[in-house]
UniProtKB/Swiss-Prot annotation:
InterPro entries: ABI. Involved in regulation of actin and microtubule organization. Part of a WAVE complex that activates the Arp2/3 complex. Expressed in seedlings, roots, hypocotyls, cotyledons, leaves, stems, and flowers. This is Protein ABIL1. The keyword Manganese does not apply. Belongs to the ABI family. Keywords: Cytoplasm, Cytoskeleton. It is found in: Cytoplasm, Cytoskeleton. GO terms for cellular component: cytoplasm; cytoskeleton. The lineage of its organism: Eukaryota, Viridiplantae, Streptophyta, Embryophyta, Tracheophyta.
Length: 298
């Protein structure tokens, strides 16, 4: 027992060596209990023979009683030793199992803590990210106005409508707004639709249309010359010249709109008049006048 205790208290021994020592002590106690059985059988045979052949039978009985008591005490002692060794081994096994379970629970708790921290950190980083507006660079407001506009990527409404509303709300009354290409295209389509709904009664309105359509995007000397040449030709030649002048004006309009947005966004752009006449109305008026003259001649 003393060697066993000293071996278990040695700190240089590993966990496997300690468990092996415990197993060896239990096996040794069990072996001693197993060897007690033949000793009791041999003692019983000796007592029986001495009682039959000896003349002092009373003394043999007294010795037999003493030996029986000692053998019983020894057997009980061995049983207690085996039971204590077994209980000790079972307790140490449970302790090892509980230690491993505790380590596993600690590792799982650390993993859960790390996962929770990662989720919170990722959510915080996503919330701190800047919201990028879902618009093209030609449709973004100037820097002075864009600072006060809050774009929401979750709300997917019409881009052109949001652009008009932002300009009408945020542009001050004294400073003119830098209008984008979408605004000019929208105003041009509205003017052409209004022009087709009304029919001109005379050829003077067609000349006024050719003059007013040339006012759109007057930004430089080169563009003024390019706009005036088709107008002069339209006044001389009539209807074909007016249609070709309108076609020639469409390309400079788009080019001037791009140049005004890229090169000088602060330059003021002249708005096209709302009341205009279409090319079709001028064409119909030009063809009605010869018919009327022919009727008068006849």
């Amino acid at each position: 027992m003393e060697t066993e205790i000293s071996g278990m208290d040695n700190p240089a021994m590993t966990l496997d060596e300690v468990s092996m020592e415990r197993n060896k002590s239990f096996v040794k106690a069990l072996q001693e209990l197993k060897n007690l059985r033949p000793q009791l059988y041999s003692a019983a045979d000796y007592c029986e023979k001495s009682y039959l052949h000896s003349e002092q039978k009373q003394m043999v009985l007294d010795n037999l009683k003493d030996y029986t008591v000692k053998a019983l005490v020894n057997a009980v002692d061995h049983l207690g030793t085996v039971a204590s060794k077994l209980t000790d081994l079972f307790d140490h096994q449970n302790s090892d199992i509980s230690t491993m379970e505790m380590r596993a629970s600690c590792v799982s708790q650390q993993l859960l803590t790390c996962r929770t921290y990662i989720d919170k950190e990722g959510l915080r980083q996503q919330q701190l990210l800047a919201v990028i507006p879902l618009h093209h660079k030609h449709y973004i407001l100037p820097n002075s106005v864009n600072k006060r506009v809050h774009f929401s990527p979750l709300r997917r409404t019409d881009t052109r409508q949001n652009h008009y509303q932002a300009i009408s709300r945020l542009q001050p009354s004294d400073a003119p707004a830098s209008k984008s290409l979408s605004w000019h295209l929208g105003s041009e389509t509205k003017s052409t639709l209004k022009g087709t709904s009304t029919v001109a009664p005379s050829s003077k309105d067609s000349k006024a249309f050719s003059k007013t359509s040339g006012v759109f995007h007057l930004l430089g000397d080169d563009e003024n010359i390019a706009n005036k040449k088709p107008l002069a030709g339209s006044q001389v030649s009539g209807v074909p010249a007016a249609s070709t002048a309108h076609k020639d004006l469409e390309v400079p309009k788009l080019l001037t709109a791009h140049r005004s947005l890229d090169n000088n966004p602060r330059r003021e752009i002249i708005q096209a008049p709302v009341r205009t006449k279409s090319v079709l109305s001028a064409f119909f008026v030009k063809q009605k006048t010869p018919k009327l003259k022919a009727g008068y001649v006849s």
